[in-house]
Amino acid sequence: MQELATTGMTIYQPMTGTTNDNVDGMLEKANRSESLGRHGGDIKGITDNLDYLADLGVTALWINPLLENNMPKQSYHGYAITDLYEIDPRFGTLEDYINLSSKMSEQGIKLIMDQVANHCGSDHWWMKDLPFEDWVNYQARFEAGEKPVFSNHKRTTNQDIYAAKIDAKEMTEGWFVDTMPDLNQDNPFMATYLIQNSIWWIETVQLGGIRQDTYPYPDKIFMSNWAGAIMKEYPNFSIVGEEWSYNPLLVGYWQDGAQNKDGYDSNLRSTMDFPMQKNIVEALKEEEKWNKGFVKIYEGLANDFHYPSPKDIMIFPDNHDMDRIHTQLNEDPVLTKMAMAYLLTLPRIPQLYYGTEILMENTTKPGDHGLIRTDFPGGWEGDQVNAFTEEGLNVEQKEMQHYLKTLLQFRKKSKAIHEGKTIHFSPKNGVYLMFRVLNEEVVVLILNKNADPVELNLSRFKEMTLEDRKLTSLFDGETIIWKDSITLSKRGALILTTNE
């Protein structure tokens, strides 16, 4: 039985990259000088570096689509697929993909496949001879050589009880861009094709999970049926859907078990926590005021009452579509470490974008997707820096890599973080505390913005019943006795644990 045990999982998102291959018959060739071009990474490159990921503490990989993407531009990105049953030969073969999954399993790492039910690439083989008159939306316009109707991107039409029918139609049936035909899931043959395709990949590769791109864009009844069909076959499987909204009400709508006014049940176990991602950045960057700073994460976490299962939601500091977290936090290593400490102790499934562990950034051009997806150093012959071996990394990068490794390995073993209850206290004087508790194990997270030493009075946290207990600091091994107060000597994150 395929399953993705979400408890204790940490997802790492790499962009494929190690070698520099060109393949005859493929439209776009490798060119490392082109920031938005193919740089030649492949499946073997990931397979060869699994030891690095396991040592870091990663327990799952979400890789951008590896299916054939024979488009003339930006084909490395993967989301304009031209064959849903073929691995892109520039990445490798089906056998390479199966081998990757097998080797990952040996290391205790799950493979999450990135899938796209909403659209395909305009060079998909079936676009040359469409099997039905309604295989894609606005097909008549396409066949007449006309521009399609584009999506209005009004995702709220999925929930809006006042939405006009035309707005809902344009949202769901409109194309993203003219190179991404919008698939018509109302066609029963298309619906069956997409469901069977997902199940085939799960079974063939022994997938651990699926990340479904642009979840609100396809027909939502189909998406419920799609997820339901997979869960019927694999009851312990997990699927995460992308809803890029900063409104927790919209994100929560898509999670399985939500009490929606329209009765909609998605069968979707996990969604992506864009609201909390934004809260984390604002909480750390803002000056402490009554409605700014740490109050953003305090009140943001309070929104968990809306989610049927908060612990199954995927939280992340950044990904391949947004500025890197180190750039968002003004390249401040202390703030970036604080973000990691908070994110990795939350009642969530954390996902980290490759390079976060070495403070990769895109500050020279915020919003530039080429910089956001810069090659991981050490994957190509001739690289002067090798993050796999630490060769060429500066002091701050090495510190961050060790910091994150310590945190990830601790998280893997902490049952309080995996299964424990969460208690947090409203921030005061630039300090925020969150506790994770399971039986005798307690994990204490303290976030402190104060540049000068501050004395933290512990009487306020009496309900945690920690008095006279010994706690150990995760990062330096120092011990304290929880009694009257503790001194916070510097700005940053402190993690204390009752486990030695």
Language-model features, listed with the residues they occupy:
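Loop/turn elements at helix/coil->beta-strand transitions in domains of secreted/extracellular proteins
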Residues: 54-61, 105-112, 206-209, 234-238, ...
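Carbohydrate-interacting/catalytic domains
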Residues: 1-2, 6, 12-15, 39-59, ...
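Aromatic- and acidic-residue-enriched segments that line the glycan-binding/catalytic groove
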Residues: 13-17, 71-83, 117-167, 253-263, ...
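Conserved, mostly hydrophobic/aromatic
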Residues: 53, 63, 84, 104, ...
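N-terminal structural segment of carbohydrate-active enzymes
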Residues: 1-110, 125, 177
